[in-house]
Each structure stands twice: as structure tokens, then as C-alpha cells.
């Protein structure tokens, strides 16, 4: 059986990257929440 996690940097960035977050209103909300919480890394 094939494992579910098949790592790919390109897929990772396109789905969870900074530009992907900035592209939608909800993604920007995610970034703002993480900034407010004081996260060291905002994305990926």
C-alpha cells in the first residue's frame, strides 16, 4: 500500500505557502492570527 504523504516542495508551497495565504481573504486571516499569536514562522 502506498503511503499517503508523498513529499513535494512545490505542492507544499502552492498549498500552504505565503503567496497562497495572501491570495485569499481567509488566508490573510490565517496570517493575521499567526502574527497575533507571535508565531516565529507564519507559513510552511
Swiss-Prot record:
Superkingdom in the source lineage: Bacteria
Assigned keywords, A-Z: Ribonucleoprotein, Ribosomal protein
Pfam families: Ribosomal_L34
Gene3D superfamilies in UniProt: 1.10.287.3980
Gene Ontology MF terms in the entry: structural constituent of ribosome
GO BP: translation
Gene Ontology CC terms, in alphabetical order: ribonucleoprotein complex; ribosome
Annotated family: Belongs to the bacterial ribosomal protein bL34 family.
NCBIfam families from the UniProt entry: rpmH_bact
The protein's name: Large ribosomal subunit protein bL34
Originating species: Coxiella burnetii (strain RSA 493 / Nine Mile phase I)
Gene this chain is encoded by: rpmH
Amino acid at each position: 500500500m502506498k503511503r499517503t504523504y508523498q513529499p513535494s516542495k512545490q505542492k507544499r508551497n502552492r498549498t500552504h505557502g505565503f503567496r497562497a495565504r495572501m491570495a485569499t481573504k481567509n488566508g490573510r486571516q490565517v496570517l493575521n492570527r499567526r502574527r497575533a499569536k507571535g508565531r516565529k514562522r507564519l507559513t510552511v
